[in-house]
Amino acid sequence: MKRTEVFLEIVAKKKGCMLCDLAIAILEEIAPEFGEGVLRWEVVDVGAREGLRRFDELTEICSRRPAVPSIIINEIIAFDNIPDMEALSAAVREALSKKV
């Protein structure tokens, strides 16, 4: 059975982070391509206590520290930067094609 949802985490410092805003804008731009409810995302704000906790969890899950900024797809580091729309869209399609 293939995935029906992709969960992305944007690892960034949220306050005043232009790259974080860019990543969200790109996600909002490509989301309609996949249909409603397929893409979910959250910002892991390394400038906040809760974000640092999740950052530590992701470091353990991914077996390495995610770069700041980076994009994690279904708990796998997909990009150590903010990709363009085409690259992110392709990565989401690949994640959807994987079996659950």
Predicted features by range, described:
Residues 40-66:
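Thioredoxin-like thiol-disulfide oxidoreductase module
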